[in-house]
Amino acid sequence: MRCLPVFIILLLLIASAPSFDALPKTEDNVPLSSFHDNLKRTRRIHLNIRECCSDGWCCPAG
């Protein structure tokens, strides 16, 4: 019975703890999801260039 008040106090402390962001962030506090979006966009651009370059007429110089 002595543990019950301690248990209740611990539950109250846990419930009142500050919440945290669900999205992981980098050192600059930028959501990591934005970096994943940039990676997807870059991959899509490179894939489009490869499809375009298979014909050989629309490849960018370089």
Curated annotation (Swiss-Prot):
GO MF term list: toxin activity
Tissue distribution of the protein: Expressed by the venom duct.
Modified residues annotated as Alanine amide in this record: 61
Protein's name according to its UniProt entry: Conotoxin Pn-B02
Cell location: Secreted
Post-translational modification: Contains 2 disulfide bonds that can be either 'C1-C3, C2-C4' or 'C1-C4, C2-C3', since these disulfide connectivities have been observed for conotoxins with cysteine framework V (for examples, see AC P0DQQ7 and AC P81755).
Entry-linked InterPro entries: T-conotoxin (IPR031565)
Species, as recorded: Conus pennaceus (Feathered cone)
This protein's UniProt keywords: Amidation, Cleavage on pair of basic residues, Disulfide bond, Secreted, Signal, Toxin
Leader peptide range in chain numbering: 1-19
This protein's record includes keyword Secreted: yes
Family label: Belongs to the conotoxin T superfamily.
Removed propeptide positions: 20-49
